[in-house]
Amino acid sequence: MTKYAKIIGTGSYLPPRRVTNHELAAQLAEKGIETSDEWIVSRSGISARHWAEPDVTSSTLAVKAAEQAIEAAGIDRQDIDLIIVATSTPDFVFPSTACIVQEKLGITNHCPAFDLQAVCSGFVYALATADKFIRSGSHRNVLVIGTEVFSRILDFNDRTTCVLFGDGAGAVVLSASDEPGILSSAMHSDGSHVDILCVPGNVAGGNITGNPFLHMDGQAVFKLAVNVLDKVAREAMEAASVSPDQVDWLIPHQANIRIMQGTAKKLGLPAERMVATVHEHGNTSAASIPLALDVAVRDGRIRPGHTVLMEGVGGGFTWGAVLLRM
């Protein structure tokens, strides 16, 4: 049985179109909806987000991020023996986006590929799942991707949500290792909070029934998020006998700078040890954590041997944390 699972490569991709708060405010003003850069930044910390063009799907973004991660890992793509894609905006109802990614990457070894849906907690759930596959000894190189095109499900008549979300993808290659990698993970859910963050529309007979756009009770999400993120982060640290002062970097889900700062403060972690990309990426749901990870790896902040705490919270309500050593 394999002892550890370790990240050996990271990658990310953002659609070229960057939409600033000023540009978005001008677009919304044409619809009679008032907002401003100051209003958005003060409530979320977001200054810009990237949105995909109409012909771009989650798999398109995922493949770009995956190619970077595989190159960084220095392995042949045919050595990937499992693909897990975390997404809430799949290309189709079925087949899975993971299968589409497999084909687009030219991986012909018939490895299993499946999607995992836990909204903004998706990447944490997927990484923890991949870790279990590797530790069981059944797989050696798992491609884990978070990818979203949330711009497709935004209600542009609701200024409280349409200004928050962006599109993008992040990926890692998680491989069997004799060195410590994933140290611990913790995951939870509470279905009694389904209604506070959801897309209530349904697909039946090829038609959408109900509201096809994202709905969020921001205040309820904020209250729950800060509470559960602190608890699940401590749960993961305690499982690995790691204290907050031993954590080099915190990578929270990039949803809202106030939630992120509140969580870091409760954990006793200084702001300079938190990776924050929300100002430039917006909330990219399952893509936010791997996007932030790749940014910090490539700019040299996160280096081999660093201890990294990732935590996410999303619709469901779902939440989770992964503690790892790079």
UniProtKB/Swiss-Prot annotation:
Domain of life: Bacteria
EC annotation from Swiss-Prot or TrEMBL: 2.3.1.180
Leading EC class: transferase
Record InterPro entries: ACP_syn_III_C (IPR013747), ACP_syn_III_N (IPR013751), FabH (IPR004655), Thiolase-like (IPR016039)
Coiled-coil zones: none
Catalytic activity of the protein: malonyl-[ACP] + acetyl-CoA + H(+) = 3-oxobutanoyl-[ACP] + CO2 + CoA
Protein name per UniProt: Beta-ketoacyl-[acyl-carrier-protein] synthase III
Organism (species): Cupriavidus taiwanensis (strain DSM 17343 / BCRC 17206 / CCUG 44338 / CIP 107171 / LMG 19424 / R1) (Ralstonia taiwanensis (strain LMG 19424))
Gene: fabH
